Design a protein with these regions (language model features):
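Conserved ABC ATPase "signature" region
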Residues: 89-116
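Conserved ABC ATPase signature
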Residues: 120-124, 128
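Hydrophobic anchor residue at the start of the ABC signature
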Residues: 134
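Catalytic Walker B motif of ABC-type/P-loop ATPase nucleotide-binding domains
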Residues: 145-148
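Conserved beta-strand-loop-alpha-helix hinge in the C-terminal portion
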Residues: 197-216
Length: 216
């Protein structure tokens, strides 16, 4: 993918500016962590970024964006709806095809939810729903991944599994994270947001938890 250049992005709610102006460059091959306290503007920045690159991005929103009445398989399959003709998508809705089952099942196996393949999302726990949303983005195979707290409902080992899969599947990503240790381990650049502004932007190798904690 080409580099993404964001210039003077702003956002306002209720007449009050909550983000920006922010300028940010995202280079191919970068794994960027957005860090900062809740309400700092991370989700708003991700949403604005998605508006700029939606044609080449996979998104894991904080609210997950799953269809509760559909199965895990169908929610994951939705990651590639645009890649297939409508008749084929309808066919998969009625009776999942072998090709897609053979692609999606191993992905769910690695995420620890292959036994939920045909279960409706509404029957899942919060962590299982989160992994379903991540599986959908991984299956999409876009140029860039944007994820808003994709491991917030997962315990330590599972969080590492998911972050490892994300790093493996996507060469370029921007991920909002609360967990500083995960940000330092799986991302090579840290962008800290405070009060709607970029307060920190540096390579992970030059940072320690003590450099990031003041943002919280």
């Amino acid at each position: 993918m080409d580099a993404v250049h964001l210039r003077n992005l702003t956002a306002a709610y209720g007449g009050q500016q909550v983000l920006g102006p922010i300028s940010l460059d995202i280079r191919p091959g970068e794994h960027i962590a957005l860090v900062g306290r809740s309400g700092a503007g991370k989700s708003t920045l991700l949403n604005l970024l998605y508006e700029q690159v939606r044609d080449r991005a996979a998104l894991v929103p904080q609210e997950q964006g799953l269809v509760q009445s559909l199965s895990v398989f169908h929610n994951v399959y939705m990651g590639r709806l645009s890649a297939n003709p409508r008749w084929y998508n309808i066919l998969n809705l009625v009776w999942p095809r072998r090709r897609e089952l053979e692609e999606i099942s191993p992905l769910l196996e690695r995420l620890g939810i292959v036994d939920k393949l045909r279960k409706p999302v509404e029957a899942l726990s919060g962590g299982q729903k989160q992994r379903t949303a991540v599986a959908r983005a991984l299956y999409q195979k876009a140029a860039i991944l944007l994820a808003d707290e994709p491991v917030s409902a997962l315990d330590g080992p599972l969080a590492h599994v998911v972050m490892g899969l994300i790093s493996e599947a996507y060469a370029t990503s921007v991920i909002a994270l609360h967990d500083i240790d995960l940000a330092l381990r799986y991302c090579d650049r840290i962008v800290g947001i405070r009060d709607g502004q970029i307060a920190l932007d540096d390579a992970t190798r030059r940072l320690s938890p003590a450099d990031i904690l003041p943002l919280y």
